[in-house]
């Protein structure tokens, strides 16, 4: 069953409504799938540049520290062996790629499940724009978002061309900005509420269904 959202303007006035396709916003939420996709996404974000030196990489230690026999001590061949201070590291981390291959269909299904969960709980909102006009205003944007939700973590999805909106909320704590083609399961689940501009919402729907939704008065 398709859901309908009221579209609100910065002044708080309802400017119409927009329909959310059930295939995108009323899909079953597969927790195991979302967990797998989020784990893969966070793993891919790791730099993987950590590195340690083995005894073969550490400089020095080419000479035998003392003779083999007659000292009463354990025999040693190099001061760069791992048991010595300044020696090499045993089984230490080396640079590696942590990314996992995740099929595109799984990524899309996980995102549908996350958005559907937010939609079913009334945590998706539609707006015409964050601020009126082309002048950024953090104060106005903060007040407007406060009328939509009192929760702390908010994901704002706006078009790439909306520079005034992006500049208005980019310094607000707890607010994260994405373009519609950057939407991902992790950021949706991390946010308490998701706020779409009509432009961004229509772009996301069109990209995933091929049929852009119109705003009705």
UniProtKB/Swiss-Prot annotation:
GO terms for cellular component: ribonucleoprotein complex; ribosome. It holds the Pfam family Ribosomal_L4. InterPro entries: Ribosomal_uL4, Ribosomal_uL4-like, Ribosomal_uL4_dom_sf. One of its GO terms (molecular function) is structural constituent of ribosome. Keywords: Ribonucleoprotein, Ribosomal protein, RNA-binding, rRNA-binding. Residues 42-100 are annotated as: Disordered. Part of the 50S ribosomal subunit. One of the primary rRNA binding proteins, this protein initially binds near the 5'-end of the 23S rRNA. It is important during the early stages of 50S assembly. It makes multiple contacts with different domains of the 23S rRNA in the assembled 50S subunit and ribosome. Belongs to the universal ribosomal protein uL4 family. This is Large ribosomal subunit protein uL4.
């Amino acid at each position: 069953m398709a859901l309908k959202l009221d579209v609100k303007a910065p002044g708080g006035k309802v400017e119409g409504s927009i329909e959310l396709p059930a295939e995108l916003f009323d899909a079953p939420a597969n927790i195991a799938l979302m967990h797998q996709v989020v784990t893969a996404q966070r793993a891919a974000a790791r730099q993987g540049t950590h590195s340690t030196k083995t005894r073969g990489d550490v400089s020095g230690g080419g000479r035998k520290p003392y003779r083999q026999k007659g000292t009463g001590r354990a025999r040693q061949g190099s001061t760069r062996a791992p048991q010595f201070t300044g020696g090499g590291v045993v089984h230490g981390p080396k640079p590696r790629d942590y990314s996992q291959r995740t099929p595109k269909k799984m990524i899309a299904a996980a995102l549908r499940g996350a958005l559907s969960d937010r939609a079913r709980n009334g945590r998706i909102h539609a707006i015409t724009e964050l601020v009126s006009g082309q002048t950024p205003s953090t104060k106005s944007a903060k007040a407007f978002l406060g009328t939509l939700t009192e929760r702390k973590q908010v994901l704002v999805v706006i078009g790439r061309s909306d520079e005034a909106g992006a500049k208005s909320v980019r310094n607000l704590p707890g607010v994260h900005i994405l373009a519609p083609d950057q939407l991902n399961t992790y950021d949706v689940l991390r946010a308490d509420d998701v706020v779409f501009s009509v432009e961004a919402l229509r772009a996301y729907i069109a990209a995933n269904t091929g049929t852009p939704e119109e705003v009705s008065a």
